[in-house]
C-alpha cells in the first residue's frame, strides 16, 4: 500500500531548512479509525486511507516505518508536484510521481479533524486546502527503542498549504 506508493517517487530536491512552527496536530479531534481502515493480505498492505477536501488521496501504512503518502494537487508547491510523503525513517518529500489512475473511493477526512491510528503518523486537515502530517516513534513503543542498523528513527513531517508547502 503506502510502501508501493513510496517506491515510485521521482526525487525532486526541496529545501529542508529549519521548518517554520509545525501545526499542533494533537489539538485536532480524532476521527473513528474504523471508517478509514483497509485490511490487506499482509501488514504492509494494511492501514488507513483518506481523502481531503482539497483533493489529496492518502494512505497510511500499519507498519510505522512506511509512514503516509498522498497524491493529488500539492498546492503551494511547483505546478508539477503531485505527491507528498513522510515516514518515521525518512524526512518529508514533495515530488512528482508518475502514477496510474486509482479509481478506489477514499473516505473524506473532514476539515478540522485528524487521523491518528497509533502507528506514529498523525495527519490533520487544517483547512479545505491544507493538510499536515507528522511521523515519529509511536507512543506505544518503549522510550529506549533502538534504531535498526540500517535506518534512523526521527520526527519528520510535511505541510501542504496555498501559502507554501514544505517538509522536514
Where are the predicted features?
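Secretory targeting and sorting signals
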Residues: 1-18
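A low-complexity, Ser/Thr/Gly/Pro-enriched, surface-exposed linker/loop concept
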Residues: 18-40, 64-111, 151-168
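Short, surface-exposed binding/anchoring microloops in extracellular/periplasmic proteins
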Residues: 45-77
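Acidic, glycine-rich flexible loop segments
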Residues: 100-141
